[in-house]
Amino acid sequence: DNSGTDQMEKAYWKEAGVAPKGTWFVSAGLGMGEVLTMAGEMRAYTLSDRATFGAYRAKTGLEILVQGDAKMFNPYGIIAVSPKKYPDINHGGAMKLIDWITSKEGQDLIASFRVNGEQLFFPGTGK
């Protein structure tokens, strides 16, 4: 599907020198939730983003086997578009949102967000 997770999976296969083909490999072509459900039913392995896995963990019986690889770091960012290029936008409001998201209060809220007790997002502004 060319998502970030799909691209990461392809990079891992390439780095390992393994062609993901054959009867042992299933290319589902589904959304992450559906893939997790399928992996749970098949008792198979899959690569997943943490947020979707957290939401599906109890439904599938799957457990995390590997985590923490720096290559899996998937940062989110926030930017305001140019008010010169898009004069009808609420640039002031966008800047207030950016200031709040990157503030200690915003970063603390991001860090406190949990699904089933597990932290999904890790602040990275350094403020």
Model-derived regions: residue spans:
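Exported/periplasmic ABC-transporter solute-binding proteins
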Residues: D1-K127
